[in-house]
Every structure is written in C-alpha cells, then in structure tokens.
Amino acid sequence: MILSDGLIKELISYRALVIEPLSETQIQPSSVDLTLGSTFLAIDNINVPFLDPKRKETIKYREIHIEKGGQLILQPGFFLLGTTTERLMLPNFLVARVEGRSSLGRMGILIHATAGYVDPGFCGQITLEISNVNNIPVALYPGMRICQVSFELLFENCVIPYGLKGKYQGQEGPEGTRIFLDFLKE
C-alpha cells in the first residue's frame, strides 16, 4: 500500500518517519518532493582506462560544490552523483521509492540510474545518480525540487533492517560506490 499525504503527515508528526528539513508544501498527494543539495561527485577518469568494481583504487571522484544562488550546468551525456538536501529516517515497516520529477524528465534529466529503492531502517541523505540524456546542457540549482519519494507499507516489520548491514547507512552528501565491499564478502 502506498501512503497518502494524510498518512505521511501522521507518521511525520509521531516521528515514526523523519524527513528533515521539510516544508509542508513539499508533501504531495502520495509522495514528498525532495530538493537538490549543493555538493556533487564526478567520476575522475584521468589515468584510469576503465572502472573495476573489484578495485576501489580505480574509482575516484572529484567533489564539486555549488554556492547558494549558483547553478550547475550539466552537459549532455554527463553523469554525476548528487544528494538530497533532506535527510530521511525510515522505520522498519516502510520502504521508500525515489523517482524523478516529470518536469525534469521532459528536459532530459534522470535522477537515478538504478538506485530508486530505499530499504526499511535506512537513515541518511539520498544519493542521486544524475545524468543528462538531452543533446543540450541543462542548468540545475541547489535547493530546487529534484525528485519525489513515495512510501510503501510492509505487511510486517522487517527482521533485518538496513541499518544492521547497509553499507550506505548514515550517508551525508553524495556517496560514491562501495561495490568493492561486495567482493570482500565472497
């Protein structure tokens, strides 16, 4: 069951669901609009012939910070990691789904390549996988509404919430891949 605005507001009022900072105007009929943070990570591909998920040293990022009132011009075909301004704390009985906004999609901006699913128990800012599939540059502004998150109720609390084993738990700002940790478990 996807939560309605009334249920979202009720869970927030009891602090069972935390979204901070949050304005009442961000709450939509069945989702919450999230805004774009001011820090981004771009893959640094200098002297790296390819990215290898097994080798952490092949995956390096350079940080980009946009000052308040500034803009980021995202070039065609370019990919970077961004973050939401808001920090979420999900209870063990909710799953969140992050989706792009239609208005930005119509300009060629995608906000996630694959990671639109947020597990119960997650706490932190949402890292966005932003790309421009248009053939012209697009301006993005910190603080603008960049995506929306909806919430689905589980039939029962999960047994192992994300916080007990999640490699991105507590992330602040955009977080680069930690896929190399998967290979250490094998």
Swiss-Prot record:
Name the residues annotated as site: Important for bifunctional activity. 116-117
Which biological pathway?
Pyrimidine metabolism; dUMP biosynthesis; dUMP from dCTP: step 1/1
Q: Which SUPFAM superfamilies match?
A: dUTPase-like
Give me the reactions it catalyses. dCTP + 2 H2O = dUMP + NH4(+) + diphosphate
Gene3D superfamilies (UniProt xref) = 2.70.40.10
User: What InterPro entries would the database entry show?
Assistant: dCTP_deaminase (IPR011962), dUTPase-like_sf (IPR036157), dUTPase_trimeric (IPR033704)
Domain of life of the organism encoding this protein: Bacteria
Write the record's keywords in alphabetical order, separated by commas.
Hydrolase, Nucleotide metabolism, Nucleotide-binding
Q: Which GO terms describe its molecular function?
A: dCTP deaminase (dUMP-forming) activity; dCTP deaminase activity; nucleotide binding
For biological process, the GO terms are: dUMP biosynthetic process; dUTP biosynthetic process; nucleobase-containing small molecule interconversion
| Residues noted as binding dCTP in the record, renumbered to the chain | 101-106, 119, 127-129, 148, 162, 171
The UniProt entry annotates the active site at: 129
Q: State which Enzyme Commission number(s) the record gives.
A: 3.5.4.30
Q: Note the subunit structure.
A: Homotrimer.
Q: Which family does it belong to?
A: Belongs to the dCTP deaminase family.
Q: Which HAMAP family match?
A: dCTP_deaminase
Q: What is this protein's function per UniProt? A: Bifunctional enzyme that catalyzes both the deamination of dCTP to dUTP and the hydrolysis of dUTP to dUMP without releasing the toxic dUTP intermediate.
Q: What is this protein called?
A: dCTP deaminase, dUMP-forming
Q: Which organism is it from?
A: Coprothermobacter proteolyticus (strain ATCC 35245 / DSM 5265 / OCM 4 / BT)
